Amino acid sequence: MRKALVCGAGGFIGGHLIKKLKREGYWVRGVDIKMHEYAPTQADEFLLLDLREPHHCWRALSLGRGETFDEVYQLAADMGGMGFIHTAECEIMHNSALINIHMIDTAARMGVPRYFFSSSVCVYRDMEPGEPALTEADAVPANPDNEYGWEKLYAERMAQAYARHYPLQVRMARFENCYGPEGTWRGGREKAPAALCRKVAEAEAGSHIEVWGDGTAIRNFTYVDDMVEGIYRLTHSDLEGAVNLGGDEYVTVAELAQLVIAVSGKRLGIRYVEGPVGVRSRNFSKDRSRLLDWEARVPLREGIARTYSWVEAQVRQAQRG
């Protein structure tokens, strides 16, 4: 039986990835600093470890009897939504850098043959609406919009260096705004889709929700089931170097907010307020991800409807105490 280690197993994408690996017949060990908050883990074994510590990385990767994991999926990071990314720059760079430094080094030294690293399209520069799609090579010369992107770019380069000097196959995906049920929806670390779903679920009919910025920023969003399928296919492919992983459905933040309101069935207004908004526009080439025979299949409206239903249930449960 193939064995996989999922780092960041207590997080949103990590929890869904474990489900995918179990369906594929793996024995899975999950590792995180916390248990999953919204769903029981399906991992065969779950270890509470702090991967900023080198000896915890050794513990995570140790199977005994000279065995190594067939695959390691490194999704552990200190991250959150736009507000968190702009206010916790030091924590993000410090914590995530330590995790990535120690995990890739330990995996390489222990003879792990295949290693997946979760990067982000935050490695790219800001864009103007209407610009041609950015390819993976356009990340250099580098000019990320935030420190989260700089740390991801550094971690990519580090992983590639280890792949050159050890018998380690590295695969890297640049995630494009993953969303869906069973993810953080309150507390400041939530991403835009979950935050909007929460605001709409909490709002009284006839009132309004607040949205940061003027609503014109352009984004694309990728449903979590599509993302984990892309991760799995990329990890088992021959594609070296980073791969943009996301859908082709681009919307403004205003359109996203209106979509959430529409699926809720409520009559609500939108009030735009000052707040961190990130880059103005996004548009990424999908040429390399198409080599995986992969594309995002869940339409945005369907994915938002599923996500809103789940977030609304969480809001109602929290209100009941």
Give residue ranges: language-model regions.
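Flexible, glycine-rich beta-alpha linker
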Residues: V123-R125, E147, R171-A192, I218
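Conserved beta-loop-beta element that borders a ligand/cofactor-binding pocket
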Residues: S119-S120, E156-T184, A205, E210
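Rossmann-fold cofactor-recognition segment
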Residues: Q42-P54
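N-terminal Rossmann NAD(P)H-binding glycine-rich loop of SDR-like oxidoreductase domains
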Residues: A4-E24
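Active-site YXXXK catalytic motif of short-chain dehydrogenase/reductase
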Residues: S96, Y148, K152
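Conserved Rossmann-fold NAD(P)-dependent oxidoreductase catalytic core, especially the SDR/UDP-sugar
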Residues: I101-N146
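NAD(P)H-binding glycine-rich loop region in Rossmannoid oxidoreductase-like domains
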Residues: L51-S96, T106-R109, M127
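C-terminal substrate-binding subdomain of Rossmann-fold SDR/epimerase-dehydratase oxidoreductases
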Residues: K20, L49, E202-G321
